[in-house]
């Protein structure tokens, strides 16, 4: 065990640093996103729950929770890592990390851990906070864990990639506001895509976040707009591609070398 720790000392130190960065500012990194997402559950769930009784046999106030939890988690995973990596580049700290005797996958994993930890804290905290309002079941825990793992891998690595390519803070925010947020809302957070008329129903199936949301919703509620196998496959392929991309950036030093 001690020899294993010694071999991966750099990974452990980098992961600890990124995790400490999240916990040090927990009121901003964890508490604030939980509160803002909880307001969605309270306002939309309680106000519309009386008008929209059920979707796919599930009460509306329960139906929206998995989507809102997923939205909060993927935004946290992306936002944390894109900001952390961009700041590390700006401070030239990342040059020291890349120059250290660490494998590319260790650097990639170490920088991604902070976003994953932050996302899990937000997701767990949001579920706990929503318990007095809604009782969200977990029908398929294995599928849920796989879906969450793939989703966080995808967006944590995506955050690393954007953090490397970004040349200003505006670029990291642009991806959140113009790409992630619209695709998340259009992916079916507040509704079932099956309710949409053509051609919007077909267009929604091009949205990658649609598959991610449905995989998580299936894990919680046992209902999905598309096959859970297809949802996990699409999310898994995208996650693998993003990990490969971010690892390649560290292996080659592309956009990292001064």
Model-derived regions, located:
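Hydrophobic transmembrane alpha-helices and immediately adjacent juxtamembrane helices
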Residues: 1-142, 146-258
């Amino acid at each position: 065990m001690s020899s294993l720790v010694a071999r991966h000392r750099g990974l452990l130190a980098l992961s600890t640093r990124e995790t400490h960065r999240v916990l040090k500012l927990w009121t901003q990194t964890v508490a604030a996103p939980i509160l803002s997402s909880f307001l969605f559950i309270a306002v939309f769930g309680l106000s519309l729950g009386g008008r929209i009784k059920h979707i796919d046999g599930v009460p509306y106030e329960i139906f929206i929770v998995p989507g809102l939890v997923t939205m909060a988690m993927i935004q946290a995973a992306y936002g944390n890592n894109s900001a952390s990596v961009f700041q590390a580049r700006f401070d030239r700290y990342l040059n020291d990390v890349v120059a250290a005797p660490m494998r590319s996958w260790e650097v990639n994993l170490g920088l991604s851990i902070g976003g994953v930890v932050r996302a899990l804290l937000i997701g767990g905290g949001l579920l706990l906070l929503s318990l007095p309002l809604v009782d969200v079941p977990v029908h398929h825990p294995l599928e849920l864990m796989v879906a969450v793992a793939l989703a966080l891998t995808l967006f944590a690595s995506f955050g690393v990639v954007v953090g490397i390519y970004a040349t200003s803070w505006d670029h990291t925010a642009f991806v959140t506001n113009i790409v992630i947020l619209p695709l998340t809302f259009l992916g079916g957070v507040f509704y079932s895509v099956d309710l949409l008329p053509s051609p919007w129903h077909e267009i929604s199936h091009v949205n990658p976040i649609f598959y991610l949301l449905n995989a998580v919703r299936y894990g919680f509620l046992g209902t999905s707009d598309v096959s859970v196998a297809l949802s996990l496959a699409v999310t898994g392929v995208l996650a693998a591609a993003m990990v490969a991309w971010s690892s390649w950036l560290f292996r080659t030093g592309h956009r990292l070398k001064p």
